[in-house]
Amino acid sequence: MAEQLTEEQIAEFKEAFSLFDKDGDGCITTKELGTVMRSLGQNPTEAELQDMISEADADQNGTIDFPEFLNLMARKMKDTDSEEELKEAFKVFDKDQNGFISAAELRHVMTNLGEKLTDEEVDEMIREADIDGDGQVNYEEFVRMMLAK
């Protein structure tokens, strides 16, 4: 299952996984799983999380290692209603709901995810996605950026 992921996706999942693997032991607790998935634009229900945890936590020790996590994410991505997921993810970033993601909004969300970015890094992320050059990211630009991964 995980072999269907691109190197870029695997690197992205590893980075997200590492953010929540506070002690660096290669495992995250099951209650952190929901937080990790939401940081990647997924929106699992409590019931879905319980099902995934049951599937992934083979030894029932309450933690999930990275290979288990990758398989889980590959499965979840395969049956994702991506249009709906993208809309939800966009709303998370677009704090004032004006239809645009500003540098300030991007910085706010990334900080909440534990990513301390410099102004230059935030500006670079906006520039990469900002096709029309207006200094912010609209929904179409966001979708194009997300699907390009």
Swiss-Prot record:
The keyword Nucleotidyltransferase does not apply. SMART domains: EFh. It comes from the Eukaryota. GO terms for molecular function: calcium ion binding; enzyme regulator activity. Ca(2+) 2 binds at residues 57, 59, 61, 63, 68. Ca(2+) 3 binds at residues 94, 96, 98, 105. The modification N6,N6,N6-trimethyllysine is found at residue 116. PROSITE patterns: EF_HAND_1, EF_HAND_2. This is Calmodulin-1. Residues 8-43, 44-79, 81-116, 117-149 form the EF-hand domain. Gene3D superfamilies: EF-hand. Induction: 5-fold induction 30 minutes after touching. It comes from Solanum tuberosum (Potato). The modification N-acetylalanine is found at residue 2. Ca(2+) 1 binds at residues 21, 23, 25, 27, 32. This protein has four functional calcium-binding sites. One of its GO terms (cellular component) is cytoplasm. Belongs to the calmodulin family. Keywords: Acetylation, Calcium, Metal-binding, Methylation, Repeat. High expression in stolon tips and stems, moderate in roots, and very low in leaves. Localized in the meristematic regions of the shoot and root tips, the tip of the developing tuber and the vascular zones of petiole and tuber. Not detected in mesophyll cells. Calmodulin mediates the control of a large number of enzymes, ion channels and other proteins by Ca(2+). Among the enzymes to be stimulated by the calmodulin-Ca(2+) complex are a number of protein kinases and phosphatases. Ca(2+) 4 binds at residues 130, 132, 134, 136, 141.
